[in-house]
């Protein structure tokens, strides 16, 4: 009932707004469409808005894709000018497109991800907005006649949605990785390195199979986390060469129909110049339109990073469990109250947030994998959902890494007293006796100590396996940590 009531209220609200708003008539090949007079978009955007009412605000096309369309249309205007497009038209298209890049026209891009799988409506959204804004820049007034600047003939000149959308996918992902993700992971890595060095002298008990194992230093444990993050950064960077290949110039099916020779090379060069990233034309446009293996590869690398961060965050929160009845080897920063019923309780919230992010990224990767596998013949038609999920994963990992660094990692402290207590209570120190009394006797001593709840030393002395001096000499945790840093 509540849902139905809200829906009715929304409908009444929209009806009221319509009554207050003036509309103009726009026309496309399907006929007349009414468009809000305050909007720059045209008939095709309006049809998409009405035909794909799916998901609402939360499912709108990511702004990075919108901004990437601005980059692409600006660069296309510059290149088309070289190939004969009227200079005044080209220059004003470029100016309008630059406003898209700068975010000045964000409210003119209302479409959701769940539309045509080629992203055609979003491409036309960009074409319509840029053409109408370009006319306004030329004349000083709004004119929706399309006579001075046409969305298809001018803004979309030498282009197809089938090559513009995948090009924008690559631009958006590459910029996001370079400007947001890599710096965030490098920040996390630096903080982890600091902790590794800080903890290098602290000898603790290791754990395998969730059971006590032989000693290592806390710094060595953190060095493993550092290497996971370092490899993750490298994996992400290793995907970039394929992302820098742009589909633009393939037009409808990859043949380059209706584009001048050299257009593909020139526009990739212009995009590279504008972004400062080494974009180049894709060597095979058929692959660039029909498959999105490069995006699947990126998503796979993001998934691997999520797997690493899940392990790291879980280890840290388990090592910080307590404060009285857990492992308690790490003291985590206390950022906020943890319970509405248990006074004084504090939880490892940054670790929990990170692990939830990792779970989401793993889910995103499943979506991208399925979508990437659905390239049929000359075109993959899952493009919008692929880029939505890739950008979501990039943003989530980047934001979570910064948050985890600032509010958790930099403030982690070691409880050296607790660590030393657990170290000397561990029966796995018996491993150091193997070379002196043999595996079988060492195992017998460990089992006796565990069963009788005595120390390992007491068990060895009781069994006559070692003297007190021999035990102290042979069972020295500082000699059991190896030379690995």
Curated annotation (Swiss-Prot):
Homotetramer. Pathway: Carbohydrate metabolism; tricarboxylic acid cycle; (S)-malate from fumarate: step 1/1. The gene is fumH. The record marks 352 as: Important for catalytic activity. It comes from Dictyostelium discoideum (Social amoeba). Residues 1-19 form a transit peptide. Substrate binds at residues 118-120, 150-153, 160-162, 208, 340, 345-347. The active site is at residues 209, 339. It comes from the Eukaryota. This is Fumarate hydratase, mitochondrial. There are 2 substrate-binding sites: the catalytic A site, and the non-catalytic B site that may play a role in the transfer of substrate or product between the active site and the solvent. Alternatively, the B site may bind allosteric effectors. It catalyses: (S)-malate = fumarate + H2O. One of its GO terms (biological process) is fumarate metabolic process. It is an enzyme of class 4 (lyase). CDD domains: Fumarase_classII. Its EC number is 4.2.1.2. Catalyzes the reversible stereospecific interconversion of fumarate to L-malate. Keywords: Cytoplasm, Lyase, Mitochondrion, Transit peptide, Tricarboxylic acid cycle. GO terms for cellular component: cytoplasm; mitochondrion; phagocytic vesicle. The keyword Mitochondrion applies. Belongs to the class-II fumarase/aspartase family. Fumarase subfamily. One of its GO terms (molecular function) is fumarate hydratase activity. The keyword ATP-binding does not apply. Pfam families: FumaraseC_C (PF10415), Lyase_1 (PF00206).
């Amino acid at each position: 009932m509540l849902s139905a009531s809200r829906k009715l209220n929304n409908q009444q609200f929209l009806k009221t707004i319509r009554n207050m708003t003036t509309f103009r008539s726009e026309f496309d090949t399907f006929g007349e469409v009414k468009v809000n007079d305050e909007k720059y978009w045209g008939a095709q955007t309006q049809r998409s808005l009405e035909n794909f009412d799916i998901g609402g605000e939360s499912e709108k096309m990511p702004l990075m894709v919108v901004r990437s369309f601005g980059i692409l249309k600006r660069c296309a205007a510059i290149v088309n000018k070289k190939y004969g497009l009227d200079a005044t038209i080209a220059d004003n298209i470029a100016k309008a497109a630059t406003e898209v890049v700068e975010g000045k026209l964000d409210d003119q891009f209302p479409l959701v991800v769940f539309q045509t799988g080629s992203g055609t409506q979003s491409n036309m959204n960009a074409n319509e907005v840029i053409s109408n804004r370009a006319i306004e820049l030329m004349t000083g007034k709004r004119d929706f006649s399309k006579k001075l600047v046409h969305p298809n003939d001018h803004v979309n000149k030498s282009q197809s949605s089938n090559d513009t959308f995948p090009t924008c996918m690559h631009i958006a992902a590459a910029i996001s990785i370079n400007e947001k993700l890599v710096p965030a992971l490098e920040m996390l890595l630096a903080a982890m390195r600091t902790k590794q060095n800080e903890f290098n002298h602290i000898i603790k008990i290791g754990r395998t199979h969730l059971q006590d194992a032989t000693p290592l230093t806390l710094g060595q444990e953190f060095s493993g986390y550092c290497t996971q993050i370092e490899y993750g950064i490298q994996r992400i960077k290793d995907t970039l060469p394929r992302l820098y290949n742009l589909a633009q110039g393939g037009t409808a099916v990859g043949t380059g129909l209706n584009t001048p020779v050299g257009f593909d090379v020139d526009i990739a060069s212009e995009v590279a110049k504008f972004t400062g990233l080494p974009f180049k034309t894709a060597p095979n446009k058929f692959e660039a339109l029909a498959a999105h293996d490069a995006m699947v590869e990126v998503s796979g690398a993001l998934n691997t990073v999520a797997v690493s961060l899940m392990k790291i965050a879980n280890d840290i929160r388990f090592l910080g469990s307590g404060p009285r009845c857990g492992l308690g080897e790490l003291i985590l920063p206390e950022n906020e109250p943890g319970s509405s019923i248990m006074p004084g309780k504090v939880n490892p919230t940054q670790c929990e947030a990170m692990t939830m992010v990792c779970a989401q990224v793993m889910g995103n990767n499943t979506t991208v994998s399925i979508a990437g596998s659905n390239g049929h013949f000359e075109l993959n038609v899952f493009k919008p959902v692929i880029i939505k999920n890739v950008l979501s994963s990039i943003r989530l990992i980047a934001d979570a890494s910064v948050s985890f660094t600032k509010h958790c990692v930099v403030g982690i402290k070691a409880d050296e007293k607790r660590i030393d207590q657990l170290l000397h209570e561990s029966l796995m120190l018996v491993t150091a006796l193997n070379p002196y009394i043999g595996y079988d006797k060492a195992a017998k001593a460990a089992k006796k100590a565990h069963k009788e709840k005595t120390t390992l030393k007491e068990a060895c002395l009781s069994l006559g396996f070692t003297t007190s001096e021999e035990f102290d000499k042979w069972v020295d945790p500082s000699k059991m940590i190896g030379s690995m840093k």
